[in-house]
Amino acid sequence: MKKTLAALIVGAFAASAANAAVVYNNEGTNVELGGRLSIITEQSNSTVDDQEQQHGALRNAGSRFHIKATHNFGDGFYAQGYLETRLVSDYPGSSSDHFGGITTKYAYVTLGNKAFGEVKLGRAKTIADGITSAEDKEYGVLNNKKYILTNGNTVGYTYKGIDGLDGLVLGANYLLAQSRVPGGPGLFPRKQGEVYPQQISNGVQVGAKYDANNIIAGIAFGRTNYKTAGADFDFSDAFGLGRKEQVEGVLSTLGYRFSDLGLLVSLDSGYAKTKYHTTTTDSDDGRQTITNPAYDEKRSFVSPGFQYELMEDTNVYGNFKYERTSVNQGKNTREQAVLFGVDHKLHKQVLTYIEGAYARTKTNDKGKTEKTGKEKSVGVGLRVYF
C-alpha cells in the first residue's frame, strides 16, 4: 500500500529518534543513543555586481550525536534529560571540510505529564522552531531566526493535545542571556559577568500549531531584547559593536495535505521589526560629536511550497520565497529565492538526496547605484543514521 505523506513527513523529522539504539531499559528508565553522519558534495557560486566567485566542496552537513534518558514515575509523570552534540567549524582555524570540532547544540532537562504538558529548562528548541512547513535538507531559503529565535537558553512550556485534540501543540518560551563578558584581559575588563553587547538579553515567545485531519496551521510571536552597546561599553563607538535593541516578529504557516495524492501544499510567511538605538561618535578630528539617530528595519516574506511522494521511499519537495527588507532611512532589499530537491531512502537508516537553490537579491539605497547579488548552490548528500 502506498505510504501516506503524513507518515513520510513524520519519518523524515524523527528518523534519528526512531533509529536510536536503546542501551538501557529497566524499571521505568530508558536510555537511548542515536545520531547521524551527513556528508555532502556541492558546487556553489555567488555573484555581486558581475564579480563571480565559485567553489566546490566535500564537507560535513549537520552530523550529530545525541543521548536521551527518560524516567517514568507513573500516573503519566516523567523526567527526561537530553544532550546533542554537532560537528562544526564555526571558529577560526577549523577545517574546510566542516569537521573542525564538537560543540553542544542542545542540553536540557524536562519534567512533564502526558495530560498536562511539560516544562523544559536548558539550551533547547523553542516553539518557533517547528512553525514553518517548508522542507529542505541543506540549502533552506527561509531564515526563521531573523524573525523569531528558534533555540537558545530557555525555560519553556509545551502542551500536546490529547482526548480529541490530537495534533494540537501549544507552547511558550522565556529566553535568557547566553553570552556574557568573560573574566581576564579583554575589551571590557570591568564588565565581567554582564551580558555581552549585542547579544540576547532576554526574550519571550508564544505559539500554536495544529497538524491533523489533513490540515496544517501554525503561528508564533516573539520579542527578543538585545544588550545595547551604550556609552558604558563603547563611548565613542570605536568598536563598531552594532546598534540592535529589540526584534519583534511573527511566523505563520497554512497547509493542506492531499492524502490520496501524496501531496502537501503550504504557505509560510513572516514579519519582523528590528529597532536600532541612537549612538554618538566623535568626528575624525575629534572636534565635534556626531549623532546617529535611531531607526527601524522591517522585513517580511511569503513562501509557497510543496512536498510530493513521487514513489515509495522517494520524495520531491520545493519552495519559493519573496522577501523584502526596508529601513526608514531609505535602504531597501528585495530577495527572490527558489529551492528544489529529491530524496530517496536506500534503507530505513540511509537517506540520499540532491538539492539545489538559487537566490537573487537587489539592494537600493539613497544616492547609490543599485546592487545585484546572485547565489547558486547544488549538492548531493548522504545521511547514515545510527
Swiss-Prot record:
It is found in: Cell outer membrane. SUPFAM superfamilies: Porins. It is a multi-pass membrane protein. The keyword Transmembrane applies. GO terms for molecular function: porin activity. GO terms for cellular component: cell outer membrane; pore complex. Its main location: membrane. InterPro entries: Gram-neg_bact_OMP (IPR050298), Gram_neg_porin_domain (IPR033900), Porin_dom_sf (IPR023614). Residues 1-20 form the signal peptide. The keyword Transport applies. The sequence of strain D2/D3R is shown here. Homotrimer. Forms pores that allow passive diffusion of small molecules across the outer membrane. This is Outer membrane protein P2. The lineage of its organism: Bacteria, Pseudomonadati, Pseudomonadota, Gammaproteobacteria, Pasteurellales. The gene is ompP2.
